[in-house]
Amino acid sequence: MVNRPYANMNDLANAVAESVQKYLDNSGQARNGLFQKTNNGERDIETERLALQHQLFHLTLDGKLQLSPLPSPVQSVLDIATGDSTWVHAFAEQNPSAYIVANDPSPTSKIPLGLSVIPDASDANEPWTYTRQFDFVHCRQHHRRLDEPRLFKQAFSSLTPGGWLEMQELSNPVTSDDGTLSENNPLSQWGRLLIEASKKMNRPVDNPAKYETWMREAGFVNCHTVAYNWPTNPWPADEKGKTLGLWNLYNVLQRFEEFSVALLVKVLGWEMDDAKTFLGNVKEELMNEGVHGYWPVYVVYGQKPAAPGSDVITDSE
């Protein structure tokens, strides 16, 4: 039996808007694109989606912007896949003296970056040509647009001795710990198909589980993987899990069909009608609170070895 508490996207959007506003008020944050109408009276859905994604990480990490033990003050930072710049804006506010490079070939920022933030539209898959080294390289939710092992090697070369690289990324497939997500559930089938299609594109969506290994191979030390769960919907009993599930469901559904159709039809060769019928079934299961599914979310960080005799912070301090 499907337990679906939201009749339509408007009901879901209203529930998310109320929940987000309460969270922002409690955490003292500005709305920055969340559920705000543009001058023509419409909402900017993509800006809204990225802003909500930032709040998902904010809640997941208990308000932290990173887990790496950075020096204070941090002097130079490179953010890869900046997107709407919400993370960069927040980091710059907390670290006003830091020089920050915000890298994204297709930025969507509508937030003033400030004088200390330098926009950079170069392709991070190409050789990096930065003229300075960084104390911290950060990358969040690049959605498999990057060659990750290559990224780790270039980050290693671009970091100062003792500097940190941190990746924050959702992984696939959706999984469950209590048997409510069967192998033949459309949601499980969808996850397997996403992995199949992404591997054909040489951008596997299950790569984040390998990040720590690749970091170590690139030369990083003091590497750590911290795993979190983003529920598929508000099925958890605890308040934090329920909130994460509510926001995550809305965030996923904003681009669910666009993203999935592209992989099923263009990569795997499905007929459009078959893809849409199948995805309708997947959507039902995404919203089914009787299915206790979640996406693994990984925060993986590692340090370039410090110079001998330096006073650089390590994770053991």
Swiss-Prot record:
Q: Which family does it belong to?
A: Belongs to the methyltransferase superfamily. LaeA methyltransferase family.
Keywords from UniProt, A to Z, are: Methyltransferase, S-adenosyl-L-methionine, Transferase
**What is the documented function of this protein?**
Probable methyltransferase; part of the gene cluster that mediates the biosynthesis of terrequinone A, an antitumor agent. The first step in the biosynthetic pathway for terrequinone A is formation of indole pyruvic acid (IPA) from L-tryptophan by the aminotransferase tdiD. The nonribosomal peptide synthase tdiA then immediately converts unstable IPA to didemethylasterriquinone D (DDAQ D), via condensation of 2 IPA molecules. The symmetric connectivity of the 2 IPA molecules is thought to arise by head-to-tail dual Claisen condensations facilitated by the TE domain.
Top EC group: transferase
**What GO molecular functions are on record for this protein?**
catalytic activity; methyltransferase activity
Pfam families per the record?
Methyltransf_23
Q: What is this protein called?
A: Probable methyltransferase tdiE
Signal sequence, renumbered to the chain:
none
- Report which gene this protein is encoded by: tdiE
Q: What is its EC number?
A: 2.1.1.-
**Pathway involvement of the protein, from the record:** Secondary metabolite biosynthesis
Gene inactivation effect: Impairs the production of terrequinone A.
Name the Gene Ontology biological process terms: methylation; secondary metabolite biosynthetic process; sterigmatocystin biosynthetic process; terrequinone A biosynthetic process
Superkingdom assignment: Eukaryota
Give the induction note: Expressed during both sexual and asexual development. Expression is positively regulated by the secondary metabolism regulator laeA.
